């Protein structure tokens, strides 16, 4: 996979799946039926379709953001709102879920790690004090803290929003898929052409290192791992299952046929 693979999400007639940098070809068969494909076929006369996507007007949810002992700039607040809505939009338009079913969550942001950890301990979530953020299903709440790298805080929020969505609409999803999607949502962005994913540099490095050291779990074994054992391995911090899950989902999202497999898996 390329370092900066961008998976653009567009809708073109029957092509509901997102389109990468590949061109879209159109041709008419002998019966007058119009076909579309992202693969060039030299046996038929094709023409390249120039897609001109409309600007997104996605604004279905009113995102509630609460801060404790800190103040976000207007730009940061908007960045959070946009990021959350991008995640909702992705699940709705690409993974074909009805996002009106999703329970909007409240986002609580603490000024530092100490305040964040104290809050978790007070709510019997002490097991998660080493995390960057946490989604609390019973309270429909995402809790994070401002990290030294503030951009990482905003990525963490998108990560936890993904968990909130999956918990609501696909509670039976295997742990690797739940976490893999959340890892990729961190890298979800939008430009004039639509939604796209950047590669996750940290996960790419971890997986490459594990492969180099012979510690990378085989994909068949990885997919068969029960969710409870997967979570135990992830929480122990001794493996690379989280990074591998993120990279595998990244791989699945890179091509229309793989995305179709992912959609079927989740439905």
How should each PLM-predicted stretch be described?
Residues 1-9:
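Bacterial N-terminal signal peptides that target proteins for export
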Residues 8-17:
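Bacterial N-terminal signal peptides
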Residues 19-86:
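Short, cationic interaction patches enriched in Lys/Arg with P/S/T/G and frequent prolines
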Residues 24, 106, 181:
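Conserved beta-strand and immediately adjacent loop positions that scaffold enzyme active sites
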Residues 38, 118-121, 194-196, 264:
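Short, solvent-exposed loop/turn and secondary-structure capping segments
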Residues 59-174:
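Juxtacatalytic substrate-recognition/specificity segment
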Residues 129-139, 172-267:
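Acidic/His/Gly-enriched intrinsically disordered linker/tail segments
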